[in-house]
Each structure stands twice: as structure tokens, then as C-alpha cells.
């Protein structure tokens, strides 16, 4: 059986931030890793002053530029199969919730779910992934494109139960987020998540007990950081994060976490799965249902 992993992300850089180490980890094992990106990230904030004219409120050319950044990130992660949902530019970055960009006629937030899911079904039937990763129903932190990616992916997976065995949402457990803040502060970063006093009030943080799966990809943290560096318009490459090399930093950013949404969990000794493909060879086609 050829193992195949499909990830559905909203914008360029999302793949590297939340699942980059996982992608590199499985690609290095010879797993077929396919990344589907739903938009070009046209509404992203540009951190490079010389490229400010590419912004949505200027020349509106950021999306095209980010295609090259995404290609470099995929190369850093060892991923060779990348696709845009419906083709590059079919769906536009919707911007943050409640902004005018939500109403753009091509905004992903406005996409017809059946049409968008059909594009993804075609990809699933092509690459035949046993495992699919996207976001939870809140899109992690409530971004409309993340929410829409969840909806589209769930709809597509429910139509391809003969192929997909397990569906996961990328997640950040409370303990890992607290550890990450500690690592950033130790590295001299006093601005990231400034003012966060109660971790439980951070929108994308989930209780530890709902996390079903932890992928220890610390050996591939360097590839994740290289992929993040590739997204130079979006991520400050000179920040303390990129100097993280201590054990706390490796543990906080090199272990990635997931919640099983469809399929059956096969936990290891610590009560969590340590392999996304655990159990896929014992599940019969058509058995995919709500997570158990």
C-alpha cells in the first residue's frame, strides 16, 4: 500500500506554520504528500517594505508573488505535489472576518460549497490519500478562509469514504502553546502574543484532553524553519523565533498536534496517536465515520 497524505490549507504559509514539520517528516519516509492551497493569500500583510506596492490596496499583485514563496517552502519541506483548489486564482483570500474583502466575488468565503468540494473530490480521487488534514470547524482562530477550508474538506471527505480513512484538524493544545510562549520569551521575543495573560482565552488554543494525535517531528524542525523563511513577505525572518534551538523550542515547535475528526484513533502508550497512519491498514473501505 502506498501511503498518501493530503493537506488542505487556506493560504500560502499556513502549511508551514501549523503542519510544516509533519509534512517534512512524512515526505522523508517516502509518503506521497500532497498540499492543496485554497487561495493565493492576496490579503496578507506585507512585512517587506520594498514589496509594499504588491498589497491588495495597491497593485494587488501579492498573490502571484506568494506562489513563488510557496514553491520554495514546499521544496524546503520535501513536498513535490502542490495544487491550488480549482486552479491558481480560482478563489481569493477573503481577509479577516468582517472586512470588505469577505464580499469580493471570488472570495473563498463566498464559494459555493458543492463546487469547491467537487474540486477537492477530484484531487482525492487522483492521489487517493488515506489521511487528510485541515482545520477544525472554527478554522483554528476564526479566519473565514480557514472555516471554509474545513467545510469544503469535510464535505469532500464524506463523499470519498471509499478512499479516505482518517480526517484530522491541526490543533494547538494549551500546554504546547504555553511552552511555546516560554520558548519565545527565553529567546528574547517580548512582542509575540504580548498581553496574553490567560492562555485559555486564546482563540486557537484547545484543551489538552481533546488532542488525539501528536507527531514528534523535532528532527525536521530545521526544514520547517526553512519553509517559514521562504514566506518572507509574511513572516519576520530576523525574529527570535528563528534562533530557537534549545530543547523547549524544539519541543514546542517541532511537535505538531491534531484532533481526529473522522475515523478511529489508535493511541500509543501515552494515550495519543503518534502516527497519522496508525490503523489505516486494518480499516475497510467505506468505514470512515465520526471519530471514535
UniProtKB/Swiss-Prot annotation:
* Name of the protein: 1D-myo-inositol 2-acetamido-2-deoxy-alpha-D-glucopyranoside deacetylase
Q: Which family is annotated?
A: Belongs to the MshB deacetylase family.
Functionally, this protein is described as follows: Catalyzes the deacetylation of 1D-myo-inositol 2-acetamido-2-deoxy-alpha-D-glucopyranoside (GlcNAc-Ins) in the mycothiol biosynthesis pathway.
Q: Which GO terms describe its molecular function?
A: N-acetylglucosaminylinositol deacetylase activity; zinc ion binding
Q: Which gene encodes it?
A: mshB
Reactions that this protein is recorded to catalyse: 1D-myo-inositol 2-acetamido-2-deoxy-alpha-D-glucopyranoside + H2O = 1D-myo-inositol 2-amino-2-deoxy-alpha-D-glucopyranoside + acetate
Task: Spell out the Pfam families in the cross-references.
Answer: PIG-L
Keywords in alphabetical order: Hydrolase, Metal-binding, Zinc
Give the EC number.
3.5.1.103
Amino acid at each position: 500500500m502506498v501511503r498518501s497524505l493530503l493537506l488542505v490549507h487556506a493560504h500560502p504559509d499556513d502549511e508551514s506554520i501549523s503542519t510544516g514539520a509533519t509534512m517534512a517528516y512524512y515526505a522523508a519516509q517516502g509518503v506521497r504528500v500532497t498540499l492543496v492551497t485554497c487561495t493565493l493569500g492576496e490579503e496578507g500583510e506585507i512585512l517587506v517594505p520594498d514589496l509594499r506596492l504588491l498589497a491588495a490596496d495597491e497593485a494587488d499583485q501579492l498573490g502571484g508573488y506568494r506562489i513563488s514563496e510557496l514553491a520554495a517552502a514546499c521544496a524546503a519541506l520535501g513536498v513535490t505535489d502542490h495544487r491550488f483548489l480549482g486552479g491558481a486564482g480560482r478563489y481569493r483570500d477573503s481577509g479577516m472576518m468582517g472586512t470588505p474583502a469577505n464580499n469580493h466575488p471570488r472570495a473563498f468565503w463566498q464559494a459555493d460549497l458543492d463546487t469547491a468540494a467537487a474540486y477537492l473530490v477530484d484531487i482525492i480521487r487522483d492521489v487517493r490519500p488515506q489521511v487528510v488534514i485541515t482545520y477544525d470547524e472554527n478554522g483554528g482562530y476564526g479566519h473565514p478562509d480557514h472555516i471554509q477550508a474545513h467545510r469544503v474538506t469535510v464535505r469532500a471527505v464524506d463523499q470519498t469514504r471509499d478512499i479516505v480513512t482518517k480526517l484530522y484538524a491541526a490543533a494547538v493544545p494549551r500546554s504546547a502553546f504555553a511552552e511555546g510562549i516560554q520558548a519565545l520569551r527565553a529567546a528574547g521575543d517580548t512582542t509575540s502574543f504580548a498581553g496574553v495573560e490567560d492562555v485559555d482565552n486564546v482563540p486557537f488554543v484547545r484543551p489538552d484532553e481533546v488532542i488525539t494525535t501528536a507527531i514528534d517531528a523535532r528532527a525536521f524542525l530545521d526544514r520547517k524553519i526553512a519553509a517559514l523563511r521562504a514566506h518572507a513577505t509574511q513572516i519576520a525572518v530576523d525574529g527570535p523565533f528563528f534562533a530557537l534551538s534549545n530543547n523547549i523550542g524544539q519541543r514546542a515547535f517541532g511537535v505538531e498536534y491534531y484532533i481526529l475528526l473522522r475515523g478511529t484513533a489508535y493511541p500509543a502508550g501515552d494515550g495519543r496517536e503518534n502516527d497519522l497512519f496508525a490503523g489505516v491498514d486494518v480499516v475497510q473501505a467505506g468505514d470512515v465515520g465520526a471519530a471514535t
